[in-house]
Amino acid sequence: MECICVIFRRPTADQALALAGVFQSAELVAKLATEGHVSEEQLSAAMSVLLNQNPETVSSLYGTVSGIELGINSMREMINDRTQASTDVMRYVIGIMYLARRLTADPVRIKQVGDGITNAKRQADHFSVTHENVIANIAGLYTDTVSTIKGRIQVTGNAFYLEQPAIAQRVRCL
């Protein structure tokens, strides 16, 4: 939760990186919703960030700039070239930010999310961060906690993909 929480503090380079991370997740959601897939590398990186609750720094979550390049490019595109795809991504970003703000104001729910992520991390250590059980666990955690907050995010895309349980679970994780 540290990565999202840092966005609401005084502007810093860490805030910019955290915001790029939110954009990156939103881009991956949009790609899953419209194309039905993201690369294993992208999914693994996003899941690793999610499971790292206590990073030394925000930049350590992403490694090199290439680890957050999709998010940085998405922010740049949002400013320079508004398309329907970028409009959807921006809507997801705003929804994520809204839900993160509401979540951080609820200590009981934030503890529940933290405990759930800790359990998923243990599971990922045993399997892998992209194992279907880890993804199902985090998707269930999202459904039980974050999705109960008023102001749900409506993901739009190809119904063929969005109706597939494995893709819906990945969307909830991201």
Predicted segments, located by residue:
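Alpha-helical structural motif
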Residues: 15-18, 92, 116, 141, ...
